[in-house]
Amino acid sequence: NFVVTDVELSVDKRFVGNKGQGLATYKELIRNMATHACPDNGALQLILDKWIGALENEVVQYEGLVPGHEVFDVRVSQKIYKITSSMEERVNGFDFGKVLASYYKGHRTGDMELQKKALRWLCGEYRTRTEAKTDLGVNLIISDDNWYEFIKLFADFVVKAGYAGLYVCMDELATLYEIPSRVGREYNYNKLLSIYNDALQGKASHLGIIISVTKEAMEDPAR
């Protein structure tokens, strides 16, 4: 019962780049999220709605409250806050949790526009911090510099939403090997190394990454 996603690395989608290639990789990964119930990608909104629905069901089942009761929304909001607060200690977790709370607020009040804004932010589609601050009250946007931290946050979140974890499949890693600039290759290799070290040191909980690469790219000592 995992959330899975994939990306095919290319000239336009890398770990690091000076033309938004890292953010493009992130956007593709979020766009390609899939679950058993939504196998054809685009599962992010389903995951969020399932999370909210599960918390609402807990309030119904264990507290005997029903939607429309004067304290029903209060109890669900408390559960939402408990989960989002638990993410604040992670890098960028405060803003991530705040956007999740905004999505729930939109669900609770019927404000579809607020939900769309939260989804836009989670998908890495905000271009300026000013716009994000105005729309969602957060001081951060997902960017080339921090996108991988948000993949780790998503891995934590999907477990809280009832899944076993997040699997990320990355194909065509040889694209990095083919970068003509030595500096560009090294930046991308260093990012790959940091991802590997996170896994080795237990800093990327509930996240599995599968990478495919050609034998030539693995064994060429010159690159």
Predicted region positions:
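The catalytic "switch" region of P-loop NTPases
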Residues: 112-223
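P-loop NTPase nucleotide-binding core
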Residues: 1-161
